[in-house]
Design a protein with these regions (language model features):
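Alpha-helical bundle segments enriched in helix-capping/polar residues
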Residues: 1-173
Length: 173
């Protein structure tokens, strides 16, 4: 298919955008030329293009992840994937800043500032989060003191009960 021939995208988001572009082609000559200028710059600036492709290769499907989060269906792995993708934004901004065509600089200016969210996820989500919420352990140790205390109680429940039993025996003897 034409999509198969043209699709050199590195992300699921890019593949969806390419498909949309093919299904709804531009009609304005100015917009077509602007897009072609962007493609030409990407083609000619191979070092910048390869760097951009490497960075984009690290970005997960943020649109899908956002949908899962908004519907309450996100897993700890999804949150970890979002965290890693948001952590790539500074690199993506840097890579895009090397381009001059308006369509590419427009992408740069359209990137949202989500540094606070990235920071929150980095401090809250544990590395190598489990696949399911029910497995627990996806909140980073040290993020919440009360949670850490509860984890400690769970991990040391047997010794806590034994100590309590000993104290009660001593008290009642």
């Amino acid at each position: 298919s034409l999509l198969w021939v043209l699709d050199q995208t590195k992300t699921a988001m890019g593949a969806r955008l390419m498909r949309q572009w093919l299904l709804s082609p531009l009609k304005s000559e100015d917009k077509i030329n602007a897009r072609l200028n962007g493609v030409e710059e990407l083609y000619n600036a191979s070092v910048l293009r390869v760097g951009l492709q490497e960075t984009l290769g690290e970005v997960k499907d943020v649109g899908r992840l956002a949908g899962k989060i908004s519907y309450g269906n996100a897993t700890p792995k999804d949150l970890e994937a979002l965290k890693k993708s948001l952590e790539m934004l500074p690199s993506l901004r840097f890579r895009l800043s090397g381009f001059a065509s308006p369509i590419l600089t427009g992408l740069l200016s359209s990137l949202p500032n989500v540094d606070d969210l990235a920071s929150l996820l980095s401090s809250a989500i544990a590395e190598n989060a489990p696949a399911l919420v029910k497995d627990g352990g996806y909140i980073r140790e040290g993020y919440d003191a009360e949670l850490d205390e509860l984890r400690g109680m769970r991990e040391h429940a047997a010794s806590l009960l034994k100590d309590m039993e000993t104290r009660e025996k001593d008290r009642t003897d």
